[in-house]
């Protein structure tokens, strides 16, 4: 069971991802929660057709990690090193306008699509949807499942993924123990 596994694991890390509510009492048996980020997981079924984006995007380079971090709303939950690692390990997409990176998306270490962000002055132009379409197509070309984790109050992102045909799966959390 999970309790036995954690005892053998010896809490070598205090960070846990994809935690379901039933797991929390086991995780917190000897530790308190320092922070918890709760999200809803949505999947995109393989049968759902996704048209390619109308706007050209291209993969991001590891050197862009600091820029992405500086413009992230999740600096408390991530690091430049983590972003750099994700850029190296999996798919990413960026949109440049007049030489400026104005929107991007990449994946988390559970391979979920994430970090979707458009600079405020460029929002409302459909760039987020175009980035998401580009990421979905890249994941499918690699034969990988497509899923996202979104905070329940992020209605704009939820509306976007529902528009593209994602289906709710479950509530999960990222947890850091203290």
Label for each model-derived stretch:
Residues 46-78:
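Short amphipathic alpha-helix that is part of the acyltransferase structural core
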Residues 104, 129, 169-174:
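Residue-level detector of high-confidence beta-strand sites
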Residues 21-33, 152-170:
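Conserved active-site alpha-helix within GNAT-family acetyltransferase domains
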Residues 119, 123, 151:
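Residue-level recognition of the GNAT/N-acetyltransferase active site
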Residues 9-20, 139-151:
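Conserved GNAT acetyl-CoA-binding A-motif
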Residues 1-54, 175-176:
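Acyl-donor-binding surface of acyltransferase catalytic domains
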Residues 1-5, 124-140, 155-159, 163:
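Conserved acetyl-CoA-binding loop-helix of GNAT-fold acetyltransferases
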Residues 80-120:
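A conserved beta-strand-loop-helix scaffold within acyl/acetyltransferase catalytic domains
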